[in-house]
Each structure stands twice: as C-alpha cells, then as structure tokens.
C-alpha cells in the first residue's frame, strides 16, 4: 500500500528566532523513531502476523537558516494479510500524528500532518493445484529441473493479473541482491528461465 505524508511545520529564522519555528523534519524524525522503536518499520513481526514497511523518499527544506516548514515523505506497507497491512498503515499514521502533537513553538503553535494511502495491488497465493501452477511445474520438470514453489514478497504484474481473474505464476530468473549495490544476475539461471519461458510459450525446448 503506497503512502504519502506531508508534514507542515512553521518557518522562522533558525538563528534569530528558532523558538518561533516548528521543524517539519523534527516531527518526521520523532515519528520515524517511534516506528522503529515499536517495531513498525522494516520487517514487522507481531505475534503470528508479519509484514514490512519502508520510508523510501524524503524531500523538504529551503535553506539552512530557515526552520524547515514542510517535508514530504513517501512510504509503503506490505503484508500477505490484508487486515495486518491496514494495521501497519494505521500505526504509521498514528506515529506521525503523535509526533506533530509533541512539538510546539514559543507561542504554543504546533505543526500538522496530512496523510494519504492507496492500495496499488493486493497480495495473493495460488493453490498448488491451480492449472497455471501445474502447467509451470510441468514445463520446469520437462527441462530436467526441480520446481520449487515459493511466496514472493515483491509486487508483480501477477498481482494485477490474478486480481482480474487470470491466475498467474511468476518464474525466478536468476536475480540476487535485488535493489542493493550487490545486485547481480546469475546467467545460467537466467538462461534456464528463458528455456522455461520458451517452453510455456511455444511448446519448444530450443
């Protein structure tokens, strides 16, 4: 679930009148610290429930001599359990709202938070008996490989296709260390995936 958060502080001169300002980045920092300390950022495990959240974009500020008046953040929440994903979103919202209430300037004024969330795709899991799963399994086995069924925590075209009535399998293609500086592609695995794709598309093996 995609999340956008606008934090509104109060601008003031950071040298002459810092007490008159409310820092938007200070509000966001308190909120993020709250989420981390209480286990609602990164990998989330609460009892039997699991999920993840991430704040991946932060933008704001005008100059070093201005108490930051506004800050925009973009985040996301994930879980294979719809209700738990909604809980994660709720906890993120509450953390930012609490943080905004904690800070005030010399005049007693506080900043504010605007919060939006939008479900980009729903999670899904296919039965091993699903026809598309059986077809993919057969293609892998026909090429002398052993299929391994896994649940993926990424967002895929398969999410949309399955949601629209087309049960869809995604095949591994040799990626490793995704979205890191160590990201790599194992060529042998990639070529195996190409062979499976060709088999599924044409019935041919080469």
Identify the function of each model-found stretch.
Residues 4, 10, 14, 19, ...:
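Metal-dependent amide/peptide-bond hydrolase catalytic core
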